[in-house]
A protein has these predicted regions:
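C-terminal segment of classical bacterial N-terminal signal peptides
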Residues: 14-24
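Bacterial N-terminal signal peptides that target proteins for export
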Residues: 1-11
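N-terminal cationic leader/targeting segments used for protein routing and processing
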Residues: 5-6, 20, 49
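Transmembrane beta-barrel domains of Gram-negative outer membranes and organellar outer membranes
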Residues: 26-264
Length: 264
């Protein structure tokens, strides 16, 4: 019952926004956990630099920075590399820190019916192996593992709706399934607000969580966008469920191989 009320409340909060800016376009991707079929465009960069905080009972984890680099090859292909620097404290123990697993990947948008039509992509990524020291600190997984996801987006009335489903093939780590849903709309020419539900299930291991978050993007200027998100678990807080998770960062859009700032 609490889950249904939370979902209904979040969707209603977005539905009550009063203005739509036709030039804006809601999407998944940072600051959200769910990805979408969008790509930067040929020879363009999308760089996301952020801080991700997750707090659960007895454990606080910070990804500072969380680096997400994306480069467009043609209009439908994106090369990606993601990696966080993790600071983690647990049960009063000393803070552990270091680089965690990297995530190189390639996104291909194989269906594109325009901004108002269906768009679909696949975005395979590799969770790379981490150093022995990082694994001993508990800030990285052994790796490698292989993520095979599918992303779908469609405009429904004033809302942009994104869905992602994926599966981690077991390499050195558990099999894991992810499901993500993002819906949102522009509020002004500068501000976009979205709601996300994200479900992450691993076989016989953590994580096993469903989270709800609200977030958005605010255009600061040409090629610069502020990113923000805050949420929590919908399953209670036992078993390592996040009592709070949040993201704050900036998106930098560059065109012509990075020579100029680009527009969204």
């Amino acid at each position: 019952m609490r889950l249904k009320k939370a979902i209904v409340f979040s969707l209603c909060a977005i539905a009550l926004t009063l203005h739509i800016a036709g030039s804006a376009h809601a999407q998944a991707g940072p600051p959200f956990l769910t990805n979408d079929p969008g790509t930067p465009g040929n020879a363009n960069w999308e760089i996301n630099l952020g801080s991700m905080q997750t707090i659960s009972r007895g454990v606080s984890s910070y990804e500072v920075p969380q680096i997400d680099l994306n480069f467009g090859l043609g209009d439908r292909i994106q090369l990606t590399y993601e990696v966080p620097y993790v600071l983690q404290s647990s049960g009063g123990q000393p803070v552990q820190s270091g680089w965690s697993n990297g995530y190189p990947g390639l996104k291909w948008r194989f269906l594109d019916e325009g901004e108002d039509g269906w768009q679909m992509s696949t975005f395979p990524q590799v969770e790379t192996g981490a150093s022995m020291r990082a694994r001993q600190k508990g800030i990285a997984a052994p790796g490698p593992r292989y993520l095979l996801p599918l992303e779908v987006t469609k405009k429904i009335g004033p809302f942009d709706v994104d869905f992602e489903a994926g599966y981690y093939l077991a390499g050195h780590g558990p099999r894991e399934r992810i499901l993500g849903f993002v819906a949102g709309r522009p509020v002004t020419k500068q501000l976009e607000l979205d709601v996300e539900i994200y479900d992450d299930r691993a076989d016989d291991a953590a994580p096993h969580s469903t989270t709800l978050d609200l977030g958005g993007r605010y255009k600061l200027g040409r090629g610069l966008i502020a990113l923000f998100m805050a949420g929590r678990s919908l399953n209670g807080f036992a078993g390592g469920q996040p009592e709070f998770m949040g993201y704050l960062g900036i998106q930098i859009l560059l065109s012509s191989y990075g020579r100029t700032f680009g527009a969204e």
